[in-house]
């Protein structure tokens, strides 16, 4: 336990809360360029090939972002819009790509929850 004199000299330092989406630098979304598009397998009880992209954000940070929905048109050098939100069964994937923004097309033939996947009404 510090003495009063030590507290006068140094004071107490409060711990900073850890930010889940540090790459966004406080923004709701960030633009980025795909550096690699690949598939990966999820953690233990689940089995699939999840679509993931490595994205270099405008903040200069490179992150892994999940590509939601069925089918996508992304490849290397595609411009994407990234938001926060982790994928529970993919370790290290803490961002999601927004469908229907910039170079990312919306999900084709999507009827429900269309706004989440960038699908227009009559398509």
From Swiss-Prot:
Coiled coil segments of this chain: none
Gene3D superfamilies, A to Z: Nucleic acid-binding proteins
Domain of life: Bacteria
Modified residue annotations for 3-methylthioaspartic acid: 89
Classification via Pfam families: Ribosom_S12_S23
Region spans: Disordered: 1-31
Keywords linked to the UniProt accession: Methylation, Ribonucleoprotein, Ribosomal protein, RNA-binding, rRNA-binding, tRNA-binding
Biased composition (Basic residues): 9-18
GO terms for biological process, alphabetical: translation
PROSITE patterns per record: RIBOSOMAL_S12 (PS00055)
Protein's UniProt keywords contain Aminoacyl-tRNA synthetase: no
Gene Ontology MF annotations: rRNA binding; structural constituent of ribosome; tRNA binding
GO cellular component, one term: small ribosomal subunit
Family membership noted in the UniProt record: Belongs to the universal ribosomal protein uS12 family.
Subunit structure: Part of the 30S ribosomal subunit. Contacts proteins S8 and S17. May interact with IF1 in the 30S initiation complex.
Function: With S4 and S5 plays an important role in translational accuracy.
Protein name, as recorded: Small ribosomal subunit protein uS12
């Amino acid at each position: 336990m510090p003495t009063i004199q030590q507290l006068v000299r140094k004071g107490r330092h409060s711990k900073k809360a850890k930010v889940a989406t540090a790459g966004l630098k406080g923004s709701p979304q960030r633009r980025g360029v795909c550096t690699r598009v690949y598939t990966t397998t999820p953690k233990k009880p689940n089995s699939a090939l999840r679509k993931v992209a490595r994205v270099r954000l405008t903040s200069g940070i490179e992150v892994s972002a999940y590509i939601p929905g069925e089918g996508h048109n992304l490849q290397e050098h595609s411009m994407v819009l990234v938001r926060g939100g982790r994928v529970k069964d993919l370790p290290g994937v803490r961002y999601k790509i927004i469908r229907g923004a910039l170079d990312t097309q919306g999900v084709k033939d999507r009827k429900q929850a269309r706004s989440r996947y960038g699908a227009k009404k009559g398509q």
